[in-house]
Regions:
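Alpha/beta-hydrolase fold active-site neighborhood
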Residues: 64, 70-78, 334-408
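C-terminal region of N-terminal signal peptides and the immediate post-cleavage residues
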Residues: 7-30
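Gly/Pro-rich cap/lid or specificity-loop segments adjacent to the active site
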Residues: 74-360
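N-terminal low-complexity, Pro/Thr/Ser-rich intrinsically disordered segments
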Residues: 28-106
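A generic alpha-helix propensity feature with a strong bias for hydrophobic helices
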Residues: 7, 21-22, 36, 40, ...
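Sec-dependent N-terminal signal peptides
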Residues: 1-4
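Intrinsically disordered and other compositionally biased segments
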Residues: 13-16, 36, 44, 53, ...
Length: 408
C-alpha cells in the first residue's frame, strides 16, 4: 500500500513511455537499489587534458571512469551472456571505416522518409556483428540548412513516433530526425519474453508492505532480468546510454553535420548530457527539456511531481461540480482515489482474463497525467469506470501503453 498516491507510480513508471523492448533498462532503473550520485554524474572527471574532438563514435573508458564504473546502472552484470539472438554481418571493410564509408539510403514512408542503418553491436569491436537502427526523417520545407535530432526519453521511447507528431513549424529549414535507440522499437530490440512475462513484472507490488512482499518484488524482478537475458543474449550488454550516445555521434557524422543540433526530453536530457560529455567539441544547439535528476533522488522527485500533477487534476475535477463523480474537493478526489488503490492492493480487479493491480492502476493514471489538462476528461472517465462501474479496462489499457505491453 502506498502512503502517497504516486509512491507506487515512481517505482512502476520511472520515465516517459518505455516500450516493451526497453523494459530491461526500465527495470534496472526502477527496481534496483539507488546508485550513488557519483555514478550518474555527467561531469568529466578532472584530467590533464580532455580531447574535445575524438574520432567519430569513440569512447575512452579511462577518460570517463565514472560513467563506466562497476556500479553504473548501465553496467549491471546479470548473468553470463548467451548468444541466442542472431545479428547481421558487419558491412564490408575493416574496423570503424567499414561504417564511416556508408551513406544513409532514405525511402518514402507516408509523408516522411525512413531508413535502416547498421551499427556495430559493440563499438569497441567494429569488426564484430552489427545491429540495425531505424530512423525517420521529416525533411525541411526547402533546402535544409541543418539537421535536428530528437529523442523523447523513456529510456526507450520511439524517436520515430516523436517525428511523426513533432511540430516542426519552428524549424522549417531543418531536417528533423528521430530514431529508435538500439534495443528498442523497430531497431534491433531487446526481447524479454511473451506478454505473460511482462505481466508478471508489472503486476508486482511496487510498494511492498512487509518483508514477504519485498522479497517477492526482488524475486520477480530477478526472474524478469533472467528472461531478458535468455531471450536477448549479448544485446543486453550493449544497450547503455554510452552506446546510444556513440550511435548518435555516428548519425551526426552520416548526415554531414560538424556539430550536433539536438532536442532531448526527459531521459533524452541525460542522453544529451552524456553526448556533451563525450564530445564537447561537437555540441551545436542543444535543448534539454524536463531534465532528469542525475542524483540518486530521481524516484523521490518523480513521485513528488506525479503527486503534484494529480493534485492539479483533482482540483480541476472538483471544480466541475456535479460533472465530477469523484468528489467535491481536491481532498475528496484524492481520498477516493487512494482508497480505490488500497482496495486493489488487497483485491485486484478482474479485467478480461487479467488483473488490474494497484501498481498497474497507478501506472495507468500516470499516463494521463503526462498529457496535462487535455487528458483530464479521459482520466475522469477511466477512474469513474473503474471505481463506480467496476470496469478497469481503460486504466489497464493506459498502463499497457505506458509499459509498452503488446497485445496477447
Amino acid at each position: 500500500m502506498a502512503s502517497s498516491l504516486f509512491a507506487v507510480t515512481a517505482c512502476t513508471s520511472a520515465g516517459s513511455r518505455p516500450p516493451q523492448s526497453a523494459s530491461v533498462r526500465r527495470q534496472s532503473a526502477s527496481h534496483k537499489p539507488s546508485a550513488s550520485p557519483s555514478v550518474t554524474a555527467s561531469v568529466v572527471p578532472a584530467q590533464d587534458k580532455v580531447d574535445t574532438n575524438p574520432p567519430v563514435a569513440s569512447f575512452d573508458p579511462k577518460a570517463h571512469a565514472l560513467m563506466e564504473g562497476p556500479q553504473s546502472p548501465d553496467r549491471q552484470a546479470m548473468h553470463p551472456a548467451r548468444d541466442n539472438k542472431p545479428f547481421s554481418k558487419a558491412p564490408a571493410g575493416k574496423g570503424t571505416n567499414r561504417y564511416l564509408s556508408r551513406k544513409i539510403s532514405w525511402h518514402d514512408c507516408g509523408t516522411f522518409q525512413c531508413a535502416d542503418i547498421p551499427v556495430p553491436l559493440d563499438w569497441h569491436n567494429p569488426d564484430g556483428p552489427a545491429i540495425t537502427l531505424a530512423l525517420k526523417r521529416k525533411p525541411a520545407e526547402g533546402a535544409a540548412k541543418a539537421t535536428l535530432f530528437i529523442n523523447p526519453g523513456g529510456p526507450g521511447g520511439s524517436g520515430q513516433e516523436m517525428v511523426s507528431s513533432f511540430q516542426s513549424s519552428s524549424f522549417p529549414d531543418h531536417d528533423v530526425i528521430g530514431w529508435d535507440p538500439r534495443g528498442t522499437g523497430a531497431s534491433t530490440h531487446v526481447n524479454c519474453g511473451p506478454a505473460k512475462t511482462m505481466d508478471g513484472l508489472f503486476s508486482l507490488d511496487a510498494s511492498p508492505d512487509d518483508e514477504a512482499e519485498w522479497n517477492e518484488l526482488i524475486r520477480g524482478t530477478r526472474d524478469f532480468a533472467r528472461s531478458c537475458r535468455a531471450y536477448s543474449g549479448q544485446l543486453l550488454d550493449h544497450v547503455s546510454t554510452i552506446d546510444t550516445a556513440r550511435d548518435l555521434d555516428y548519425l551526426r557524422y552520416l548526415v554531414g553535420n560538424k556539430k550536433l543540433d539536438y532536442l532531448g526530453v526527459s531521459y533524452g536530457t541525460f542522453l544529451g548530457a552524456t553526448y556533451a560529455e563525450l564530445y564537447p567539441g561537437r555540441v551545436g544547439h542543444m535543448v534539454l527539456d524536463s531534465t532528469v535528476n542525475i542524483t540518486n533522488h530521481d524516484t523521490v522527485s518523480q513521485a513528488v511531481g506525479f503527486d503534484r500533477a494529480f493534485g492539479d487534476f483533482a482540483q480541476w475535477c472538483a471544480n466541475r461540480g456535479n460533472r465530477c463523480a469523484l468528489g467535491t474537493s481536491e481532498a475528496e478526489v484524492r481520498k477516493a482515489t487512494l482508497n480505490f488503490l488500497d482496495r486493489l492492493d488487497a483485491h485486484p480487479m478482474k479485467v478480461a482474463g487479467r488483473e488490474l493491480t494497484q501498481s498497474l492502476a497507478a501506472t495507468g493514471i500516470a499516463l494521463f497525467l503526462y498529457s496535462g489538462k487535455q487528458a483530464y476528461s479521459y482520466l475522469t472517465a477511466a477512474l469513474v469506470g473503474a471505481m463506480k462501474d467496476g470496469n478497469g479496462g481503460y486504466l489497464l489499457a493506459a498502463s499497457d501503453y505506458l509499459n509498452g505491453r503488446g497485445q496477447d
